[in-house]
Design a protein with these regions (language model features):
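Alpha-amylase-like alpha-glycosidases and glucanotransferases acting on alpha-linked glucans and related
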Residues: 1-102, 168-170
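Loop/helix patches that line or flank the sugar-binding groove of alpha-linked glycan CAZymes
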Residues: 58-170
């Protein structure tokens, strides 16, 4: 699904799946409460002011029908934006950005995603090569794809973005 999120232009630079409507703006503002809860290490008891001005704990913030924050200690939270399976954060953000989004803005958005993970309380989990804007060319199951999609050029001289079609879906 091409619905945008926090780093990919939701509301402020809509793609073909989003409209930049007032309802999307309100949803993004409400979703910022989740981001605040996650930056605090997912602490269930952490008190903060929501976008609506209410003072709540992280456990009172809804994330898809469950509490956004649930930990007693930030060390209980693993923070990540992408992992070893499925697309990299670079791949998925390329898919979700509006077509005309400049490369420099896409890179900044990817850096924001990585920065949130690194600066939030908790344990950061960084997918190998994320700092190099690593791509697996949208391969959702690269385990069976071999080195073509899984190798990392640590020099940063090459990229796998858009370098061939991913395997057929499982």
């Amino acid at each position: 699904v091409q619905n945008q999120g926090f780093i990919s232009g939701w509301f402020y630079a809509p793609n073909s799946a989003n409209s930049g409507s007032p309802a999307e703006r309100d949803a993004l503002i409400k979703d910022s409460d989740n981001i605040r809860a996650w930056l605090a290490g997912g602490l269930a008891g952490y008190r903060f002011q929501t976008a609506e001005g209410n003072v709540v704990t992280g456990a009172n913030i809804d994330y898809r029908g469950q509490p956004s924050a649930y930990t007693a200690d930030p060390q209980e939270a693993i923070n990540y934006a992408s992992k070893h399976d499925n697309e990299t954060i670079w791949d998925i953000s390329q898919y979700k950005h509006a077509t005309g989004t400049a490369l420099a803005e896409r890179v900044r958005a990817d850096n924001v995603a990585t920065s949130v993970i690194m600066l939030a309380q908790g344990i950061p989990f960084i997918h190998a090569g994320t700092e190099l804007l690593r791509s697996k060319s949208m391969d959702r199951n690269s385990y069976a794809s071999g080195d073509w999609y899984n190798e990392i050029d640590w020099t940063g001289a090459t990229s796998k973005w858009n370098k061939g079609l991913p395997r057929p879906a499982d």
